[in-house]
C-alpha cells in the first residue's frame, strides 16, 4: 500500500504543472499631446497597435511574462493620444518539455494577460476623455507559429 502511494506521489510530482501566481501592471503611460484642441475636432481616428511579449525565468520554476501593448491613435494627421501598458504575470510552470514550455510562455501566458491589458488600456483612454478603445482579440497561437517559422527561416533555429 505504501509503495503504491509513493509511486502515485512521485508521478504527481513529475506531471506538468501550471499555476498563475500574480497578474500586475508593470508600466503604464498615456500622452495626449494635442489636447485640449483635439477634443474640438471631428473625430475620425486611425488606430495603430504594437504588441510585444517577453519572458524571464525567475527562481524555482517561476516565470515572469510581460505583454506590452502600445497604441497610437491619430485623428487625421495629428496624434490624438499614445497609450502603453506592460501587463505582467508570474507563472509557476514545471515539468514541461522544451517545446511545450516555449509555447506556454510565448502564446498561452500572453493569452491570459491580454484581457487585463486591453481593459487597462481602455480605462486609461476613457480617463483621458477619449472614446472607448475596443481592441479585437489576438490569436497568440498564430503569432507564436509565425515567429517560430520566421526564426527557422532566418537561421534554422529550433525551439529548445
From Swiss-Prot:
First-listed, main subcellular location of the protein, grouped into a coarse class: cytoplasm
Gene Ontology MF, one: unfolded protein binding
InterPro entries: SecB, SecB-like_sf
Keywords assigned by UniProt, alphabetized: Chaperone, Cytoplasm, Protein transport, Translocation, Transport
A Gene Ontology BP annotation from the UniProt entry: protein transport
Intracellular or extracellular location(s): Cytoplasm
Signal sequence interval, chain numbering: none
CC per GO annotation: cytoplasm
Binding partners and assembly: Homotetramer, a dimer of dimers. One homotetramer interacts with 1 SecA dimer.
PANTHER family listed in its UniProt record: PROTEIN-EXPORT PROTEIN SECB (PTHR36918:SF1), PTHR36918
Cross-referenced NCBIfam families: PRK05751.1-4, secB
Similarity comment text for this entry: Belongs to the SecB family.
Role description: One of the proteins required for the normal export of preproteins out of the cell cytoplasm. It is a molecular chaperone that binds to a subset of precursor proteins, maintaining them in a translocation-competent state. It also specifically binds to its receptor SecA.
Name of the featured protein: Protein-export protein SecB
Gene, per the UniProt record: secB
Amino acid at each position: 500500500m505504501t509503495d503504491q502511494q509513493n509511486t502515485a506521489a512521485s508521478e504527481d510530482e513529475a506531471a506538468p504543472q501550471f499555476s498563475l501566481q500574480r497578474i500586475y501592471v508593470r508600466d503604464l503611460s498615456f500622452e495626449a499631446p494635442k489636447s485640449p484642441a483635439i477634443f474640438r475636432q471631428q473625430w475620425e481616428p486611425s488606430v495603430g497597435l504594437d504588441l510585444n511579449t517577453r519572458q524571464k525565468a525567475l527562481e524555482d520554476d517561476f516565470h515572469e511574462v510581460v505583454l506590452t501593448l502600445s497604441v497610437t491613435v491619430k485623428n487625421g494627421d495629428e496624434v490624438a493620444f499614445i497609450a502603453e501598458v506592460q501587463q505582467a504575470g508570474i507563472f509557476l510552470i514545471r515539468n514541461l518539455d522544451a517545446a511545450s514550455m516555449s509555447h506556454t510562455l510565448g502564446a498561452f501566458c500572453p493569452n491570459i494577460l491580454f484581457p487585463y491589458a486591453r481593459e487597462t488600456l481602455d480605462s486609461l483612454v476613457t480617463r483621458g476623455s477619449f472614446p472607448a478603445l475596443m481592441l479585437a482579440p489576438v490569436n497568440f497561437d498564430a503569432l507564436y507559429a509565425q515567429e517560430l517559422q520566421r526564426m527557422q527561416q532566418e537561421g534554422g533555429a529550433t525551439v529548445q
